[in-house]
């Protein structure tokens, strides 16, 4: 199996490349840490599976989901596996919705990683493990993050150029989707789902 690995942390990338090759199931693993190098390599060589991180802030202005979309626009048949430490339901759903073949946590053992890659190669995925989540819109995410930071609602409405009544409607929609009834519950649920990072 030939793998293209894109991760912005060199130590992790180089170490994983070495371990994958040592697994004997992977015949070739090409590691890149910059977006330009990734797309050049992707176009020039053929790979069975592409391993892609979500957080690529040290290597690209885009995140892994955006890179995933670019990959599939170039070659819709590409098998892309998201390999990330962000093991949250909302990220898993987004990954599969955008066409990822699998979503794997970086904390898994090498044995499990290889087995999951074998499954991907055989066109098998883990869709049945993805919970049914009603995804928030981009505007709802902005509002959720603002209220969780403690921003005054009047200020939030002004910044978004909407009335306070419209803002309250958005907030109620957010609560309904998250199945919560107040800001504290919304904050805890948002962290669990991956919409926001903990404040501490």
Where are these regions (language model features)?
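Hydrophobic "lid"/C-terminal helical patch
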Residues: 117, 147, 190
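Short, cationic motifs built from Arg/Lys/His that form the positively charged side of catalytic pockets
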Residues: 13, 72, 139-140, 171, ...
């Amino acid at each position: 199996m030939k793998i293209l690995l894109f991760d912005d942390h060199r130590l992790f990338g180089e170490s994983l490349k070495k371990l994958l090759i040592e697994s004997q199931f992977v015949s070739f693993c090409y590691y890149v840490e910059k977006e330009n190098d990734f797309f050049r390599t992707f176009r020039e060589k053929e790979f069975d599976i592409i391993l892609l991180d979500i957080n690529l802030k040290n290597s690209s202005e885009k995140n892994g989901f955006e890179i995933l979309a670019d990959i599939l626009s170039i070659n819709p048949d590409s098998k892309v596996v998201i390999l990330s430490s962000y093991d949250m339901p909302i990220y898993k759903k987004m990954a599969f919705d955008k066409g990822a073949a699998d979503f794997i946590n970086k904390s898994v053992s090498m044995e499990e990683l290889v087995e999951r890659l074998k499954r991907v190669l055989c066109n098998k995925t883990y869709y049945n493990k993805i919970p049914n989540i009603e995804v928030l819109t981009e505007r709802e995410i902005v509002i959720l993050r603002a209220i969780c930071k403690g921003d005054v609602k009047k200020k939030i409405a002004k910044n978004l150029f909407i009335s306070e009544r419209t803002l309250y409607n958005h907030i109620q929609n957010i609560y309904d989707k998250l199945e919560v009834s107040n800001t504290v519950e919304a904050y805890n649920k948002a962290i669990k789902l991956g919409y926001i990072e903990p404040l501490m």
